[in-house]
């Protein structure tokens, strides 16, 4: 499973809200020897794959051309809408 991601340039609550209104959501990739990286993902692409078991095993994220193997560590969902608010990924 592979997803395209873009490094986030803006941080904070306002920037995250603008992402969500644009059909994206913020995420972070951490672990290993590299520094944590804030990214943005397209909500529609991810939410359609989340009900598959292989989503929680290993994912390839293409972050600005570099491929990183990750595993979802934490998912924050909206209280009553079927939306993802934020995700944490750990490098494997």
Swiss-Prot record:
GO biological process: translation
Protein name: Large ribosomal subunit protein bL25
Keywords associated with the record: Ribonucleoprotein, Ribosomal protein, RNA-binding, rRNA-binding
One GO cellular component, as annotated: cytosolic large ribosomal subunit
Designated gene of the protein: rplY
Annotated organism of origin: Aliivibrio salmonicida (strain LFI1238)
Functional note: This is one of the proteins that binds to the 5S RNA in the ribosome where it forms part of the central protuberance.
GO molecular function: 5S rRNA binding; structural constituent of ribosome
Subunit structure of this chain's protein: Part of the 50S ribosomal subunit; part of the 5S rRNA/L5/L18/L25 subcomplex. Contacts the 5S rRNA. Binds to the 5S rRNA independently of L5 and L18.
